[in-house]
Amino acid sequence: MSNLTVFVGGSVGKDPRSPKTWSGSCAPFLDALNSAGILNRAVGFAVPRFHNSLLLAKNFNRNRSIWRSHYYFDPAYRNALTRAARRIPVHTLFLLQLGHMFSLPQAFPDKKCISYHDGNLSERLKSGFGLAGLSAKRIDQALRYEEQVANQMTAVFTFSEYLRQSFVGDYHVPANRVFNVGGGINLTEIPPIRPDKTYSAPRILFIGTEFRRKGGPQLLEAFRIVRESIPDAELHIAGPTGLETIPDGVHFHGHLSKADPAQRHKLESLFRDSTLFVLPSLYEPFGIAPLEAMVYQLPCLVTDGWALRETVTPSLTGDLVPKGAVEPLASKIIELLSDPQRLAAMGRRGREHVLGEFTWDAVARRITDTIVSI
Protein backbone atom coordinates (compact mmCIF):
# COMPACT_ATOMS: atom_id res chain seq x y z
CA MET A 1 0.00 0.00 0.00
CA SER A 2 2.68 2.54 1.10
CA ASN A 3 0.24 5.40 0.61
CA LEU A 4 0.88 7.41 3.77
CA THR A 5 3.28 10.30 4.44
CA VAL A 6 3.81 11.24 8.09
CA PHE A 7 4.65 14.85 9.00
CA VAL A 8 6.48 15.59 12.26
CA GLY A 9 7.06 19.31 12.76
CA GLY A 10 7.47 21.89 15.49
CA SER A 11 9.65 21.66 18.56
CA VAL A 12 11.70 18.68 17.35
CA GLY A 13 13.45 20.31 14.41
CA LYS A 14 13.83 18.31 11.22
CA ASP A 15 14.29 14.79 12.59
CA PRO A 16 10.99 12.89 12.33
CA ARG A 17 12.40 10.14 14.56
CA SER A 18 13.57 12.44 17.35
CA PRO A 19 13.38 10.78 20.79
CA LYS A 20 12.64 14.21 22.27
CA THR A 21 9.08 14.40 21.02
CA TRP A 22 5.86 12.54 21.68
CA SER A 23 7.31 10.85 24.78
CA GLY A 24 9.82 9.04 22.58
CA SER A 25 7.10 7.37 20.52
CA CYS A 26 7.98 8.67 17.04
CA ALA A 27 10.58 6.07 16.06
CA PRO A 28 8.67 2.95 17.19
CA PHE A 29 5.46 4.32 15.68
CA LEU A 30 7.11 4.94 12.31
CA ASP A 31 8.82 1.53 12.42
CA ALA A 32 5.44 -0.14 12.98
CA LEU A 33 3.84 1.73 10.08
CA ASN A 34 6.74 0.70 7.88
CA SER A 35 6.44 -2.95 8.92
CA ALA A 36 2.72 -2.81 8.15
CA GLY A 37 3.57 -1.70 4.61
CA ILE A 38 1.59 1.53 4.84
CA LEU A 39 4.37 4.12 5.29
CA ASN A 40 5.76 5.83 2.21
CA ARG A 41 8.03 8.17 4.18
CA ALA A 42 8.23 10.39 7.25
CA VAL A 43 9.34 14.01 7.03
CA GLY A 44 10.51 16.48 9.63
CA PHE A 45 10.49 20.23 9.13
CA ALA A 46 10.79 23.54 10.98
CA VAL A 47 10.22 27.26 10.54
CA PRO A 48 13.19 28.84 8.68
CA ARG A 49 15.83 30.13 11.09
CA PHE A 50 15.47 33.88 10.47
CA HIS A 51 11.67 33.85 10.69
CA ASN A 52 11.91 31.65 13.77
CA SER A 53 14.19 34.22 15.45
CA LEU A 54 11.63 36.96 14.78
CA LEU A 55 8.86 34.85 16.32
CA LEU A 56 10.98 34.13 19.39
CA ALA A 57 11.70 37.85 19.81
CA LYS A 58 8.02 38.71 19.37
CA ASN A 59 7.00 36.32 22.17
CA PHE A 60 9.88 37.00 24.57
CA ASN A 61 9.22 36.56 28.28
CA ARG A 62 11.75 36.36 31.11
CA ASN A 63 10.03 33.19 32.26
CA ARG A 64 11.28 30.58 29.80
CA SER A 65 8.25 28.35 30.27
CA ILE A 66 5.83 31.19 29.45
CA TRP A 67 8.06 32.30 26.56
CA ARG A 68 8.02 28.80 25.09
CA SER A 69 4.25 28.42 25.40
CA HIS A 70 3.46 31.88 23.98
CA TYR A 71 5.74 31.07 21.06
CA TYR A 72 4.14 27.70 20.31
CA PHE A 73 0.62 29.06 20.82
CA ASP A 74 1.21 32.04 18.49
CA PRO A 75 -0.94 31.67 15.34
CA ALA A 76 1.90 33.29 13.38
CA TYR A 77 4.22 30.44 14.39
CA ARG A 78 1.67 27.79 13.45
CA ASN A 79 0.96 29.46 10.12
CA ALA A 80 4.71 29.65 9.42
CA LEU A 81 5.04 25.96 10.23
CA THR A 82 2.17 25.18 7.87
CA ARG A 83 3.93 27.10 5.10
CA ALA A 84 7.09 25.10 5.80
CA ALA A 85 5.07 21.89 5.44
CA ARG A 86 3.63 23.09 2.14
CA ARG A 87 7.12 23.25 0.63
CA ILE A 88 7.60 19.50 1.09
CA PRO A 89 6.80 17.46 -2.04
CA VAL A 90 4.30 14.67 -1.42
CA HIS A 91 3.31 11.75 -3.63
CA THR A 92 0.72 9.97 -1.49
CA LEU A 93 -3.02 10.43 -1.08
CA PHE A 94 -2.99 10.18 2.71
CA LEU A 95 -1.04 12.56 4.95
CA LEU A 96 -0.80 12.18 8.71
CA GLN A 97 0.43 14.82 11.15
CA LEU A 98 1.35 14.33 14.79
CA GLY A 99 -0.38 16.87 17.01
CA HIS A 100 -1.90 20.30 16.35
CA MET A 101 1.09 22.56 15.66
CA PHE A 102 0.33 23.04 11.96
CA SER A 103 -2.42 22.36 9.42
CA LEU A 104 -1.96 19.82 6.64
CA PRO A 105 -5.46 20.54 5.25
CA GLN A 106 -4.38 24.14 4.66
CA ALA A 107 -1.07 23.07 3.14
CA PHE A 108 -2.50 20.27 0.98
CA PRO A 109 -6.24 20.84 0.42
CA ASP A 110 -6.39 18.14 -2.27
CA LYS A 111 -5.12 15.37 0.04
CA LYS A 112 -6.80 13.23 2.68
CA CYS A 113 -5.34 14.62 5.90
CA ILE A 114 -5.32 12.91 9.29
CA SER A 115 -4.06 14.07 12.68
CA TYR A 116 -3.00 11.81 15.56
CA HIS A 117 -3.07 12.91 19.20
CA ASP A 118 -2.21 11.77 22.71
CA GLY A 119 -3.82 14.89 24.23
CA ASN A 120 -5.29 18.28 23.42
CA LEU A 121 -5.40 21.79 24.84
CA SER A 122 -9.01 21.52 25.93
CA GLU A 123 -8.17 18.70 28.34
CA ARG A 124 -5.00 20.46 29.45
CA LEU A 125 -7.07 23.54 30.31
CA LYS A 126 -9.36 21.45 32.48
CA SER A 127 -6.32 20.15 34.37
CA GLY A 128 -4.74 23.59 34.91
CA PHE A 129 -1.23 22.23 34.40
CA GLY A 130 1.43 24.03 32.37
CA LEU A 131 -0.61 27.16 31.67
CA ALA A 132 0.26 29.43 34.62
CA GLY A 133 1.18 32.94 33.50
CA LEU A 134 0.00 32.50 29.92
CA SER A 135 -2.17 35.23 28.47
CA ALA A 136 -5.85 34.42 28.01
CA LYS A 137 -5.55 35.72 24.46
CA ARG A 138 -2.83 33.23 23.53
CA ILE A 139 -4.69 30.33 25.12
CA ASP A 140 -7.88 31.26 23.29
CA GLN A 141 -6.00 31.58 19.98
CA ALA A 142 -4.44 28.15 20.41
CA LEU A 143 -7.74 26.57 21.44
CA ARG A 144 -9.53 28.00 18.41
CA TYR A 145 -6.69 26.89 16.15
CA GLU A 146 -6.85 23.31 17.41
CA GLU A 147 -10.62 23.17 16.94
CA GLN A 148 -10.40 24.65 13.45
CA VAL A 149 -7.67 22.28 12.27
CA ALA A 150 -9.37 19.22 13.80
CA ASN A 151 -12.56 20.02 11.91
CA GLN A 152 -10.66 20.39 8.63
CA MET A 153 -9.23 16.87 8.89
CA THR A 154 -10.52 13.93 6.92
CA ALA A 155 -10.08 11.97 10.15
CA VAL A 156 -8.72 12.46 13.66
CA PHE A 157 -6.91 9.58 15.40
CA THR A 158 -6.55 9.44 19.18
CA PHE A 159 -4.62 7.38 21.71
CA SER A 160 -7.73 6.75 23.81
CA GLU A 161 -11.51 6.75 23.90
CA TYR A 162 -11.33 9.46 26.57
CA LEU A 163 -9.56 11.76 24.10
CA ARG A 164 -11.84 10.73 21.26
CA GLN A 165 -14.80 11.93 23.31
CA SER A 166 -13.00 15.24 23.94
CA PHE A 167 -12.57 15.92 20.22
CA VAL A 168 -16.24 15.15 19.66
CA GLY A 169 -17.58 17.06 22.68
CA ASP A 170 -15.12 19.94 23.06
CA TYR A 171 -14.04 20.55 19.47
CA HIS A 172 -17.31 19.47 17.83
CA VAL A 173 -15.68 17.14 15.32
CA PRO A 174 -18.32 14.74 13.91
CA ALA A 175 -18.11 11.45 15.78
CA ASN A 176 -17.82 9.43 12.57
CA ARG A 177 -14.53 11.19 11.78
CA VAL A 178 -12.77 10.58 15.12
CA PHE A 179 -11.16 7.17 15.68
CA ASN A 180 -9.55 5.71 18.79
CA VAL A 181 -6.60 3.76 17.35
CA GLY A 182 -4.76 3.53 20.68
CA GLY A 183 -1.13 4.04 21.61
CA GLY A 184 1.86 1.80 22.16
CA ILE A 185 4.79 1.04 24.42
CA ASN A 186 8.27 2.32 23.60
CA LEU A 187 10.42 -0.68 24.51
CA THR A 188 13.14 -1.63 22.03
CA GLU A 189 12.87 -5.25 23.20
CA ILE A 190 10.04 -7.02 24.98
CA PRO A 191 11.44 -8.51 28.20
CA PRO A 192 10.90 -12.25 28.58
CA ILE A 193 8.14 -13.37 30.88
CA ARG A 194 9.33 -14.35 34.36
CA PRO A 195 7.17 -17.18 35.73
CA ASP A 196 9.27 -17.17 38.91
CA LYS A 197 8.97 -13.43 39.65
CA THR A 198 8.21 -12.90 43.34
CA TYR A 199 6.28 -10.08 44.98
CA SER A 200 7.21 -10.47 48.63
CA ALA A 201 9.56 -7.46 48.70
CA PRO A 202 7.54 -4.24 49.26
CA ARG A 203 9.26 -2.29 46.49
CA ILE A 204 7.32 0.56 44.83
CA LEU A 205 8.38 2.18 41.55
CA PHE A 206 7.50 5.70 40.34
CA ILE A 207 8.66 7.02 36.96
CA GLY A 208 7.87 10.55 35.82
CA THR A 209 9.91 13.53 34.67
CA GLU A 210 7.25 16.09 35.65
CA PHE A 211 7.25 15.19 39.33
CA ARG A 212 4.45 17.51 40.47
CA ARG A 213 2.08 16.76 37.57
CA LYS A 214 2.65 13.03 38.02
CA GLY A 215 1.57 13.21 41.67
CA GLY A 216 5.06 12.80 43.15
CA PRO A 217 4.47 15.01 46.23
CA GLN A 218 1.26 13.13 47.07
CA LEU A 219 3.08 9.81 46.70
CA LEU A 220 5.81 10.93 49.11
CA GLU A 221 3.16 11.85 51.69
CA ALA A 222 1.39 8.53 51.18
CA PHE A 223 4.67 6.64 51.43
CA ARG A 224 5.31 8.05 54.91
CA ILE A 225 1.99 6.51 55.97
CA VAL A 226 2.86 3.23 54.23
CA ARG A 227 6.13 2.97 56.19
CA GLU A 228 4.20 3.08 59.45
CA SER A 229 2.53 -0.22 58.48
CA ILE A 230 5.33 -1.68 56.33
CA PRO A 231 8.63 -0.38 57.78
CA ASP A 232 10.80 -2.08 55.15
CA ALA A 233 8.86 -0.62 52.20
CA GLU A 234 10.99 1.04 49.53
CA LEU A 235 10.03 3.74 47.03
CA HIS A 236 12.21 4.04 43.93
CA ILE A 237 11.84 7.30 41.99
CA ALA A 238 13.18 7.87 38.47
CA GLY A 239 12.52 10.73 36.09
CA PRO A 240 12.92 14.10 37.81
CA THR A 241 16.34 15.76 37.85
CA GLY A 242 16.15 16.44 41.58
CA LEU A 243 14.10 16.22 44.78
CA GLU A 244 13.98 18.81 47.57
CA THR A 245 14.10 16.11 50.24
CA ILE A 246 14.62 12.35 50.17
CA PRO A 247 12.69 10.72 53.04
CA ASP A 248 13.67 7.44 54.66
CA GLY A 249 13.04 4.48 52.41
CA VAL A 250 13.11 6.57 49.23
CA HIS A 251 15.74 5.74 46.59
CA PHE A 252 16.21 8.53 44.06
CA HIS A 253 17.69 7.58 40.68
CA GLY A 254 17.36 10.88 38.79
CA HIS A 255 16.52 11.18 35.13
CA LEU A 256 17.18 7.97 33.19
CA SER A 257 17.34 8.17 29.39
CA LYS A 258 16.53 5.15 27.24
CA ALA A 259 18.98 6.54 24.68
CA ASP A 260 21.89 5.93 27.07
CA PRO A 261 22.69 2.17 27.35
CA ALA A 262 23.78 2.34 30.99
CA GLN A 263 20.76 4.38 32.03
CA ARG A 264 18.42 2.16 30.03
CA HIS A 265 19.89 -0.88 31.80
CA LYS A 266 19.25 0.79 35.17
CA LEU A 267 15.67 1.56 34.17
CA GLU A 268 15.12 -2.05 33.10
CA SER A 269 16.49 -3.32 36.41
CA LEU A 270 14.09 -1.05 38.32
CA PHE A 271 11.17 -2.48 36.37
CA ARG A 272 12.39 -6.05 36.94
CA ASP A 273 13.05 -5.71 40.67
CA SER A 274 9.96 -3.75 41.74
CA THR A 275 6.68 -5.26 42.86
CA LEU A 276 4.21 -2.37 42.35
CA PHE A 277 4.15 0.60 39.96
CA VAL A 278 2.44 3.73 41.28
CA LEU A 279 1.55 6.84 39.25
CA PRO A 280 -0.96 9.06 41.11
CA SER A 281 -0.97 11.76 38.41
CA LEU A 282 -2.89 15.01 38.76
CA TYR A 283 -3.12 15.11 34.97
CA GLU A 284 -2.16 12.29 32.60
CA PRO A 285 -3.43 12.46 29.00
CA PHE A 286 -2.45 8.85 28.26
CA GLY A 287 0.31 7.26 30.33
CA ILE A 288 2.87 5.06 28.59
CA ALA A 289 4.91 4.33 31.73
CA PRO A 290 2.19 2.18 33.39
CA LEU A 291 1.86 0.15 30.19
CA GLU A 292 5.60 -0.50 30.08
CA ALA A 293 5.51 -1.43 33.77
CA MET A 294 2.82 -4.02 33.04
CA VAL A 295 5.04 -5.63 30.39
CA TYR A 296 7.47 -6.26 33.26
CA GLN A 297 4.59 -7.93 35.19
CA LEU A 298 4.10 -4.98 37.53
CA PRO A 299 0.58 -4.28 38.79
CA CYS A 300 -0.22 -0.58 38.44
CA LEU A 301 -1.88 1.79 40.89
CA VAL A 302 -2.90 4.95 39.04
CA THR A 303 -5.30 7.86 39.24
CA ASP A 304 -8.95 7.22 38.44
CA GLY A 305 -9.11 9.55 35.44
CA TRP A 306 -8.39 10.25 31.77
CA ALA A 307 -7.13 7.35 29.66
CA LEU A 308 -5.68 5.62 32.73
CA ARG A 309 -9.15 4.17 33.30
CA GLU A 310 -8.83 2.43 29.94
CA THR A 311 -5.37 0.98 30.49
CA VAL A 312 -5.59 -0.23 34.11
CA THR A 313 -8.50 -2.50 35.08
CA PRO A 314 -9.29 -2.48 38.83
CA SER A 315 -8.68 -5.81 40.58
CA LEU A 316 -7.39 -7.37 37.34
CA THR A 317 -4.24 -5.47 36.31
CA GLY A 318 -3.98 -3.01 39.20
CA ASP A 319 -6.23 -0.44 40.80
CA LEU A 320 -7.42 3.17 40.67
CA VAL A 321 -7.31 5.90 43.33
CA PRO A 322 -8.98 9.33 43.54
CA LYS A 323 -6.93 12.23 42.19
CA GLY A 324 -4.81 13.98 44.82
CA ALA A 325 -6.11 11.89 47.75
CA VAL A 326 -3.17 10.90 49.96
CA GLU A 327 -4.80 8.60 52.54
CA PRO A 328 -6.72 6.45 50.01
CA LEU A 329 -3.47 6.16 48.04
CA ALA A 330 -1.57 4.99 51.12
CA SER A 331 -4.33 2.53 52.08
CA LYS A 332 -4.40 1.00 48.62
CA ILE A 333 -0.60 0.65 48.50
CA ILE A 334 -0.64 -1.13 51.88
CA GLU A 335 -3.49 -3.39 50.75
CA LEU A 336 -1.71 -4.41 47.55
CA LEU A 337 1.75 -4.88 49.05
CA SER A 338 0.23 -7.09 51.74
CA ASP A 339 -1.00 -9.64 49.20
CA PRO A 340 1.90 -10.94 47.03
CA GLN A 341 -0.24 -13.64 45.39
CA ARG A 342 -2.74 -11.04 44.24
CA LEU A 343 0.10 -8.90 42.87
CA ALA A 344 1.45 -11.89 40.94
CA ALA A 345 -1.93 -12.58 39.32
CA MET A 346 -2.33 -8.90 38.39
CA GLY A 347 1.16 -8.86 36.94
CA ARG A 348 0.47 -11.82 34.65
CA ARG A 349 -2.82 -10.37 33.42
CA GLY A 350 -1.35 -6.92 32.91
CA ARG A 351 1.42 -8.20 30.66
CA GLU A 352 -1.05 -10.15 28.51
CA HIS A 353 -3.32 -7.11 28.29
CA VAL A 354 -0.60 -4.72 27.11
CA LEU A 355 1.02 -7.08 24.60
CA GLY A 356 -2.40 -7.76 23.12
CA GLU A 357 -3.65 -4.18 22.87
CA PHE A 358 -0.95 -1.55 23.39
CA THR A 359 1.86 -2.21 20.93
CA TRP A 360 2.70 0.00 17.96
CA ASP A 361 2.15 -2.98 15.67
CA ALA A 362 -1.43 -3.19 16.94
CA VAL A 363 -1.83 0.56 16.41
CA ALA A 364 -0.46 0.29 12.85
CA ARG A 365 -3.00 -2.44 12.06
CA ARG A 366 -5.86 -0.27 13.33
CA ILE A 367 -4.60 2.72 11.34
CA THR A 368 -4.31 0.61 8.19
CA ASP A 369 -7.86 -0.73 8.60
CA THR A 370 -9.23 2.75 9.30
CA ILE A 371 -7.50 4.41 6.34
CA VAL A 372 -8.93 1.78 4.01
CA SER A 373 -12.41 2.69 5.27
CA ILE A 374 -12.05 6.44 4.66
Positions of PLM-derived features:
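Carbohydrate-associated surface elements
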Residues: 162, 184
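Aromatic "clamp/platform" in nucleotide-sugar-dependent glycosyltransferases that forms part
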Residues: 282
